[in-house]
Amino acid sequence: MNGLTVVFAGTPEFGLPCLDALIQSRHHLKAVYTQPDRPAGRGRKLQESPVKEWAINHQISVYQPLNFKNQEAVDELSALKPDVMVVIAYGLILPKAVLEIPRLGCINVHASLLPRWRGASPIQHAILHGDAESGVTIMQMDVGLDTGPMLCKAACPVTSSDTAGSLHDKLAKMSVKPLLDVLEALASNSAQFELQNNELATYAGKINKEEARINWHQSAVEIDRKIRAFNPWPVAYTLAGELMLRIHQAKATDIMSTEMPGMVLNIDKTGMLVATSDNALLVEKIQFPGAKVISVRDWLNSGKTQLHTGLMLQ
């Protein structure tokens, strides 16, 4: 049985473990599609995507169409004659004309247990909503938003200390085996498809910076989830006077408080205790504008005074 001719489409780091596995597999990785280089950083220099950097390092052809609205981009893909297209966080909509090019269709590695958390930010939403488990789903793509029939699922627990960053890394690594299993099943014509139950679908819309502000009138558990879900981006924040204070790490406590939500109850080497709508939140790692991430303990040792007991965080 011959290996499959694979075209890969993806942009961020999430797809790199699967790319590493693909190039070592018996399948033939013919080309990589990724988003165009974008300006980034203070100098606004054009930056290549992690997937493009990987492809160049491995001497794989790279294609970067703006979209697939023009026939030229569609024809270019068609000329590669792929058996299958593997799509992981590509970031471009694939029209029906593109989905129909590969002989075995396009398959997507999605970072949730579908049909829960269809959409752009499944990892963040799993943490925000306190899900006990997350995982990856390999599905056949159709024109809907993460609505296609499922080929394989793999689950993992979401721990109370998981951030979007740590869960992202776990799911990226655990995507490899289910993807390779699905490719083998497709190659041997033994793939099993399971339709999604649309009644169970939930949607994870795109996260934006405006959502990152902490509402101290929420519970300590809800605020803790938000801080973890928004780490490493966009990072949850509050206002300490007129200063934006980013909070990188905190945990809910069982200390009850009757003070106004947002009031700093205490600061010591264990952290900064802040009142919420129920129990206090212990803030452990912070970042002031233009400064590095620092533990509250180290901040106290620095002798600075912007934070103090009785301060109202907004």
From Swiss-Prot:
Name of the protein in question: Methionyl-tRNA formyltransferase
Keywords assigned by UniProt, alphabetized: Protein biosynthesis, Transferase
Binding site for (6S)-5,6,7,8-tetrahydrofolate: 112-115
EC number annotated for this UniProt entry: 2.1.2.9
GO CC, alphabetical: cytosol
Primary enzyme class: transferase
Keyword Protease: no
GO MF annotation list: methionyl-tRNA formyltransferase activity
PANTHER family in UniProt: METHIONYL-TRNA FORMYLTRANSFERASE, METHIONYL-TRNA FORMYLTRANSFERASE, MITOCHONDRIAL
Domain of life the protein comes from: Bacteria
Organism per entry: Legionella pneumophila (strain Lens)
Catalytic activity: L-methionyl-tRNA(fMet) + (6R)-10-formyltetrahydrofolate = N-formyl-L-methionyl-tRNA(fMet) + (6S)-5,6,7,8-tetrahydrofolate + H(+)
Disulfide bonds: none
Family of the protein in this entry: Belongs to the Fmt family.
InterPro entries: Fmt, Formyl_trans_C, Formyl_transf_N, Formyl_transf_N_sf, Formyl_transferase-like_C_sf, GART_AS, Met-tRNA-FMT_C, Met-tRNA-FMT_N
Free-text function comment from the UniProt entry: Attaches a formyl group to the free amino group of methionyl-tRNA(fMet). The formyl group appears to play a dual role in the initiator identity of N-formylmethionyl-tRNA by promoting its recognition by IF2 and preventing the misappropriation of this tRNA by the elongation apparatus.
